[in-house]
């Protein structure tokens, strides 16, 4: 089942146990639209959404970023192996993300995608337990395909939160994972084409020779600067589904036990050693059984500075519904980065959920829960408008 949820700055999908109606009044400012189960009716000046008044069973649930259907279906099947998904949320998230790694989802998850400046693919991944607040993560993982499973081993077999680089690979070998090349003919061709085009775009600044026309090697500019003025818009990097894409997944059982996880091969043509938001708790994902969870995707270099997943969960802790929480998680970024691109999913512990996006044409995401009308698994889509930085907040 596919639902298109309108065009606006923020389009939010929310399931709830009981509703009457919602009215969103238009104004000269960009407006917020919300969509619920049920039919909508549009009139001049007002968008009225009739909600489903019946009580809907929302849990258990699996929700993930992007149209990664196979990952969601597998996670849902694993979650349902026990009644109500009890004690299966970790297995569901790890196996769901692992499925995407194996399928090389959009070539932005798993091996054979997003080569760095040297042509190598490295992986980042994280698993977070909302009951214990324990986290296992890996970053810059080399020569190991199973990033999310290595992250699980960090969680279950160490007292650390994150392992990185070659040392993370050595840990993976000790845990029984085999080393193998993450480079494929496709990723090699991608890198060769990039170098043939003078390494454009790249992530360097304030260096010489000019990084906008040269591959380097680079050195710092000799003139010291007190503040660097960026002369390259972030949207020049083509951030979106085919770059900076991450699978972020949340699984919740009927007792509101929550796990969240992420996996990615990072930004295409990144400087070697770069780590994005995906393996950072509070940035790529965050989970707390007392509140809910959130996962993010987009420009990780920017997002990790603001911890949007943590902001969304803390907004729900303060009593805000997922729709407002998702906005709040991204609004902080927009204060400083008007050319930012990204999306955020927020889910409360009861299974109510919302998605917010900015700067992309649209943001699809997958949901599996008993609330589906044509089966448990459905695709939902958010349409976004770039270049806007103000929204009207509607009380839900």
From Swiss-Prot:
The keyword Hydrolase belongs to this UniProt entry's keyword annotation: yes
Record's signal peptide: 1-23
Enzyme Commission designation: 3.5.1.26
Pfam families: Asparaginase_2
CC terms in the record's Gene Ontology section: lysosome
Disulfide bonds: 100-105, 199-215, 357-384
Post-translational modification: Cleaved into an alpha and beta chain by autocatalysis; this activates the enzyme. The N-terminal residue of the beta subunit is responsible for the nucleophile hydrolase activity.
Active site (catalytic residues): 246
UniProt keyword list: Autocatalytic cleavage, Disulfide bond, Hydrolase, Protease, Signal
Recorded superkingdom: Eukaryota
SUPFAM superfamilies the UniProt entry points to: N-terminal nucleophile aminohydrolases (Ntn hydrolases) (SSF56235)
Oligomeric form and interacting partners: Heterotetramer of two alpha and two beta chains arranged as a dimer of alpha/beta heterodimers.
UniProt function note: Cleaves the GlcNAc-Asn bond which joins oligosaccharides to the peptide of asparagine-linked glycoproteins.
The protein, known as: Putative N(4)-(beta-N-acetylglucosaminyl)-L-asparaginase GG24090
Organism expressing this protein natively: Drosophila erecta (Fruit fly)
């Amino acid at each position: 089942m596919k639902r298109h949820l309108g065009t606006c700055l923020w389009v939010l999908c929310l399931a709830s146990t009981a509703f009457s109606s919602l009215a969103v009044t238009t104004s000269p400012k960009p407006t917020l639209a919300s969509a619920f189960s049920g039919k909508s009716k549009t009139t001049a000046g007002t968008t009225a959404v009739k909600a489903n008044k019946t009580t809907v069973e929302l849990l258990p649930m699996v929700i993930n970023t992007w149209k990664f259907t196979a990952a969601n279906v597998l996670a849902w099947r694993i979650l349902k192996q026990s009644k109500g998904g009890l004690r299966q949320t970790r297995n569901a998230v790890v196996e769901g993300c692992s499925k995407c790694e194996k399928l090389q989802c959009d070539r932005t998850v798993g091996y054979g995608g997003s080569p760095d400046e040297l042509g190598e693919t490295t992986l980042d991944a994280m698993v977070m337990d909302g009951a214990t607040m324990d986290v296992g993560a890996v970053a810059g993982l080399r020569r190991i395909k199973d990033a999310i499973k290595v992250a699980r081993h960090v969680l279950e077999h160490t007292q650390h939160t994150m392992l990185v680089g070659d040392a993370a690979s050595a840990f993976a070998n000790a845990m029984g994972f085999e080393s193998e090349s993450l480079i494929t003919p496709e990723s090699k061709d991608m890198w060769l084409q990039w170098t043939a085009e003078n390494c454009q775009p790249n992530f360097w600044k304030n260096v010489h020779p000019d990084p906008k026309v040269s591959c380097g090697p680079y050195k710092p500019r000799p003139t010291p600067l007190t503040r660097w003025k960026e002369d390259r818009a972030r949207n020049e990097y083509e951030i979106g589904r085919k770059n900076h894409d991450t699978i972020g997944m949340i699984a919740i059982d009927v007792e509101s036990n929550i796990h969240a996880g992420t996996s990615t091969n990072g930004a295409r043509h990144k400087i070697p050693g770069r780590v994005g938001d995906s393996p950072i708790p509070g940035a790529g994902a965050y989970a707390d059984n007392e509140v809910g969870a959130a996962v993010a995707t987009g420009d990780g270099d920017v997002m990790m500075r603001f911890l949007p997943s943590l902001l969304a969960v803390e907004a729900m802790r303060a009593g805000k519904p997922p729709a407002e929480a998702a906005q709040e998680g991204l609004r902080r970024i927009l204060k400083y980065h008007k050319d930012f691109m990204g999306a955020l999913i927020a889910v409360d512990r009861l299974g109510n959920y919302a998605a917010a996006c900015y700067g992309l044409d649209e943001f699809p995401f997958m949901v599996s829960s008993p609330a589906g009308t044509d089966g448990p698994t459905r695709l939902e889509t958010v349409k976004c408008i770039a270049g806007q930085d103000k929204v009207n907040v509607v009380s839900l």
